[in-house]
From Swiss-Prot:
Belongs to the UPF0344 family. InterPro entries: UPF0344. Keywords: Cell membrane, Membrane, Transmembrane, Transmembrane helix. The chain crosses the membrane at residues 6-26, 38-58, 65-85, 92-112. It comes from Bacillus cereus (strain ATCC 14579 / DSM 31 / CCUG 7414 / JCM 2152 / NBRC 15305 / NCIMB 9373 / NCTC 2599 / NRRL B-3711). GO terms for cellular component: plasma membrane. NCBIfam families: PRK13673.1-1. The lineage of its organism: Bacteria, Bacillati, Bacillota, Bacilli, Bacillales. It is a multi-pass membrane protein. This is UPF0344 protein BC_1150. Signal peptide: none annotated. It is found in: Cell membrane.
Length: 121
């Protein structure tokens, strides 16, 4: 399940940047955007399944940290969607980019720091 979740995130980020580049070039990115929305569903479902498997075995404050990681992941998805919708409507996206980047850094940090993630830190 972990590999499926990581693959879904990687594909989601790739589709996000492809859709962003299409919108910023003034072309239609609706099809890529819809594919990205499908990836959102897969990311949320696999993330929730991972969270539920962790709840069964985690001890101490691990529930809280994984809950915060899940919340930050949902903020990343919300930030991605808001950036693309505002881009398609030609509205400013500065604040939404800030939310997206801060949440993405938090998700990567927690993903690498917590026990299921890679042992970088």
């Amino acid at each position: 399940m972990v590999h499926m979740h990581i693959t879904a995130w990687a594909l989601g980020l790739i589709l996000f940047f492809v859709a962003y580049s299409l919108y910023s070039a003034g072309r239609k990115g609706k099809g890529v955007h819809m594919g990205l929305r499908l990836m959102y569903i897969i990311i949320i479902v696999t993330g929730f399944m991972l969270y539920m498997s962790i709840v069964k075995t985690a001890t101490g404050s691990m529930h809280m940290w994984y809950g915060l990681k899940m919340l930050a992941g949902i903020l990343v998805i919300g930030g991605m969607e808001m950036v693309l919708v505002k881009m398609s409507k030609n509205k400013p996206t500065g604040a939404v980019w800030g939310l997206f980047i801060v949440a993405l850094v938090a998700v990567f940090y927690l993903g690498l720091k917590l026990p299921i993630g890679w042992k970088v830190f």
